[in-house]
A protein has these predicted regions:
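Electrostatic, structured charged patches in enzyme active sites and in nucleic-acid/phosphate-binding
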Residues: 1-134
Length: 134
C-alpha cells in the first residue's frame, strides 16, 4: 500500500502510484529488450509463518490431537519480481515519505531476513532485494 499517492490505471492494470506505473514501463521495456525475464507484479511472500499449537481435545470416546492456529501468517507483497542474470530480483518502489510510514521498515527487515534465509538454504546468492526510492 502506498500512503501519499492515489491509484493509477495504465496499460489495463492498476498501480498503487504513478511512480510504480512508470517503473513498470521501464521494466517492461527491459524485458522486451531481453535484459530481464519473468516480470511479475504484486508477488506475495510469507515473512512470518502462522503460529500453530497442538492441543489434546477430549471427545466422548477418545482424545484427539488438534492443531490450533493462534496467529495467521504475515505476508510481504513485492511490487515487482523478475529474473536478471540468473538472480531473482524482488523490487519495491517507494517514495521517501512512504519509506517511513507505519509498518514498512519492519516488513523490509523481515523480507531481507527471508531472502537471506533462502540464499543460505540454496548456498548461493539467488535472491536480491532492491528498493527504488523516488
Amino acid at each position: 500500500m502506498k500512503y501519499f499517492s492515489s491509484k493509477v490505471k495504465m496499460y489495463g492494470m492498476t498501480f498503487d502510484s504513478k511512480t510504480e506505473a512508470s517503473h513498470y514501463m521501464k521494466l517492461k521495456t527491459r524485458q522486451d529488450n531481453g535484459e530481464i525475464t519473468n516480470l511479475q507484479l504484486q508477488v506475495e511472500f510469507e515473512i512470518i509463518p502462522k503460529l500453530v499449537v497442538d492441543e489434546l481435545k477430549v471427545l466422548k470416546t477418545k482424545t484427539k490431537l488438534v492443531h490450533k492456529v493462534l496467529e495467521r501468517a504475515a505476508h510481504y507483497t513485492a511490487d515487482f519480481v523478475y529474473e536478471e542474470k540468473g538472480k531473482i530480483i524482488i523490487e519495491e518502489v517507494k517514495s521517501r515519505g512512504t519509506m517511513l510510514a507505519r509498518d514498512y521498515p519492519l516488513r523490509r527487515k523481515l523480507i531481507r531476513k527471508k531472502i537471506a534465509e533462502m540464499n543460505n538454504y540454496l548456498g548461493v546468492e539467488r535472491y536480491e532485494f532492491r528498493e527504488i526510492i523516488r
